[in-house]
Structure formats: C-alpha cells, structure tokens
Amino acid sequence: MGVACDVFSPNALGAVLDEEGVARLDCQVVAGGANNQLARPEHGEALPERGILYAPAYVINAGGIINVSLEYLCRQHGKPCDINEVRKRIAQIPDRLGEIWRESERSGRSPGVVADAMARKLIGR
C-alpha cells in the first residue's frame, strides 16, 4: 500500500484495510481474492469517500460457492448437476457487482454494506 496503482488487489491476508491501510491507498479500485479484506466494516465507508471503487471479495469470488451449492442441491435431489446452469449463474456476477455499485452510489452506503444487505435479502435473513 502507498504505491500508486490502478487496482489494489489483496489476495492472501485478510484485514489489510484498516484505518491506516485505507489512508495509504493510492488506487482507483480495490478488488482481490482475500477474505475479509476490511479489518472492520466501517473501513469500507472511507473508500467511496476517497473515490475508490470497492468490489467486495465474496461477490467477485462467488463462483466457487455457486458451484459447490449447486452440486450439493443436485445431490440432495438425486439429479445430475448441469454445468451450464453453474456457468449461467457465474456469468451474472458482473451484473450483480454493477447493481451493488449503482445502489451504493444512489444510497450513499458503501459497496460492502450494500452487498451485505443484498445477501441477507437473498438468503432470507
């Protein structure tokens, strides 16, 4: 962090974006594979304020869980898993991310807060 770049991509360690880490970012986008990139959810609030686009990790990394969940459901119902259905759902990830960013901009809430709310609504909690 602190190096000028287009995309900061945390891919190994979680909680790298704490108050100090966010302040040191010199990028336009944060998008990576590490789980729990934000040390605390409120650290995500500072990203849009600084003009940094944040892609919540569990959204952009959803392909694996989509595949596993469909395999599980197919087994539970004694049906073969259709790889085309998996691919179709994975192909929706960019659209979902766009929805998150649009709602974030519209509502003033951070992308992480918006993504969490959408996830809770989808799973019924």
Where are these regions (language model features)?
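Adenosine-phosphate binding glycine-rich loop
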Residues: 28-125
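C-terminal amphipathic alpha-helical segment
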Residues: 1-7, 53
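Rossmann-fold NAD(P) dinucleotide-binding segment
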Residues: 1-3, 14-30
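A general structural motif
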Residues: 9-16, 34-39
